Amino acid sequence: MLEIELAIPEFTAPKTANDLARKLNNRQSLLLIAYDQAKPVAYKLGYQLNENTFYSWLGAVLPEFRGQGIAKQLLLAQESWVKAQGFMAIEVKSMNRFKTMLQMLIAHDYHIISCKPAQQSTEVKIRFRKQLG
């Protein structure tokens, strides 16, 4: 997963193993990785936010593998697992600069629940929530 994280040109501050350990410490979590042959090409990582909500924290697809539906497959697999674990909702944050992600979330019934302003409009943080079941 960190190998993919480091190869994403849009990520100006890639996460480290320490970042992951701090965030996931003692939380129920899920890491999904998509492979092309034996090469990891995409991932989706999330964790339990509270008793009823799962937070989809990180995800990325290597540039040369985008447009193939991999992110959608990971999103749907994550939703299925989260629902099976008994969570009632999934939350995720994105930014205006990730237009494809915003479109995918809206297309899959994620609703905007808040926005955090930024000096540049591309950096506005948008929080989405999807009710499950």
Regions found by a protein language model. Give the residues of each.
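Acetyl-CoA-dependent GNAT
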Residues: 1-57, 62, 118
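Short acidic/polar active-site loop segments enriched in Thr and Asp
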Residues: 52, 88, 111
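Conserved acetyl-CoA-binding loop-helix of GNAT-fold acetyltransferases
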Residues: 61, 67-80, 107
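Conserved short alpha-helix immediately C-terminal to the canonical SAM/SAH-binding motif I
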Residues: 74, 98-101
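Conserved GNAT acetyl-CoA-binding A-motif
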Residues: 82-94
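Conserved catalytic-core motifs of GNAT/GCN5-like acyltransferases
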Residues: 91-95, 106-127
